[in-house]
Amino acid sequence: MRGRTCPVLIFLLLLSAQSRADTGCVDLAQLAHSTVGITRYFDEADRNAQPGLVGIHGTAWFQSPTTIVTAAHVASGMKLSTQEWKSLKLEDGADSQSISVRIRRLAGGHAEKLAELELQTAVSNARSVAIRISPLAPEDRVVTFASPNQRLRAVAGRFVQYPDNGRLAGTALFEIYEGDNRLVIDHGASGAPVFDCEGRVAAVISTVITQTLATPFGEMRIPTPWGSPNVVSVPVQQLMEFSEAQ
C-alpha cells in the first residue's frame, strides 16, 4: 500500500460523490450565499483540444459581490485569463446564473496559488466572508463544503498542521470527514473555503491525500488512517502575499 496526493480535485463533469456530517462548529446560516459551485462549459475549440471533456467544475467563495476566490489550478483548468471574459455558471443551492469572469490576480508564493476572479456583473445576494488573519492551532475545528453531484454540502473536520518543509511546505493540512466517510472531499471541492468556528475563511482546498491498495482486481483508492490529514489546502493569508497576473 502506498500514499499519494491526488493533484486535481476538479470535477470533470463525469463523476459523483456521497456522504453527510456534523457541522455544529458554526451556524450554517452565517455561511449562506458565501460559497458557490462554478462550472465552465468548453466551447468547440476547447473540446477539440481535449476530446471527451465538456467542462470543468470547482468551488469558489465571495470576497465581494464582484470577486470570487478559488484554487489557481481550477482557474487554469477552466482556461481563464486576465484579458478575455469567459462565461461561468455559478450555482448557489437551487439558484444558478451565468456570469462572465476573468482572472484579476494569482496570489501566493508556493506551487499552488489562489486565484481572484473578477465578475463582470455583481451578484446581488452574495455574502462576502471575513478572512482569518491569525494561523490556526492544531485541533481547531473547521467546516468546509463537499461537492457531491455538483451540490454543495457542509462537512466538518479539524486542523492538523502547517508543514514547514518538503513538498507540502506552505500548505495547511486538515482531516475532513462525514461520519465514517473520509473521502467526502473529492472531485469538485477544489477552491472550497475552510471556515473556522467564527465563520472566517482560514484556507482554500487544493488537493486530497489518499492511499492506494493493490488488489487482485487492480488498484483501489482508500483513505488515509484516522487521525492523519487527508486534505491539503492553501492558507488564505497568501492573499496578502506576493501576487501576479498572467
Residue ranges and their predicted role:
Residues 1-7:
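Bacterial N-terminal signal peptides that target proteins for export
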Residues 31-52, 118-127, 151-245:
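Active-site region of chymotrypsin-like
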Residues 22-27, 61, 77-80, 102-107, ...:
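Active-site substrate-binding loop(s) of clan PA
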Residues 32-34, 56-58, 64, 84, ...:
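Envelope-exposed proteins and targeting segments
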Residues 57, 63-112, 207-212, 216-219:
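Catalytic-histidine neighborhood of serine endopeptidases
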Residues 24-25, 45-71, 191-192:
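A conserved glycine-rich beta-strand in the N-terminal activation segment of trypsin-fold
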Residues 16-18:
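N-terminal signal peptide c-region/cleavage motif recognized by signal peptidases
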